[in-house]
């Protein structure tokens, strides 16, 4: 759909080391962009791809999830999805207490997110 081909990579740890381990399979896949499980994986992926001679974002765009402080401090700064972690934790506790008190709770709770565009993403090259 929309000319996008999705390729899943095998499971790697949700850490910088896991991201480094995912670099070779990501490079071999021919992907022009990767959305990582979290920012730590994305940062490890960025480092691992650089070691393989791949430039971010010229060769491959990388997006993380969480918007940890380090995401904006690296070069290139990491594009990421900011999640309302504190709000979701507080909401989870509220829902648990409601359920324990026998109060009916919504089956689905939607929390917003925000894409923070930084320097790790760009349009794919024409080649």
Model-assigned labels for residue ranges:
Residues 1-127:
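Bacterial carbohydrate/catabolite-sensing allosteric modules
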């Amino acid at each position: 759909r929309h000319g996008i081909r999705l390729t899943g990579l095998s499971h790697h740890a949700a850490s910088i080391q896991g991201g480094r381990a995912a670099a070779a399979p990501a490079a071999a896949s021919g992907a022009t962009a990767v959305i990582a499980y979290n920012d730590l994986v994305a940062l490890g992926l960025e480092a691992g791809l650089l070691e393989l001679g791949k430039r971010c974002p010229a060769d491959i765009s990388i997006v993380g999830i969480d918007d940890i402080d380090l995401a904006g401090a690296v070069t290139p700064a990491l594009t990421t999805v900011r999640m309302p972690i504190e709000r979701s934790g507080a909401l989870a506790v509220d829902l648990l207490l409601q359920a324990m008190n026998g109060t009916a709770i919504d089956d689905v709770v939607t929390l917003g997110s925000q894409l923070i565009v930084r320097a790790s993403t760009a349009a794919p090259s024409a080649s």
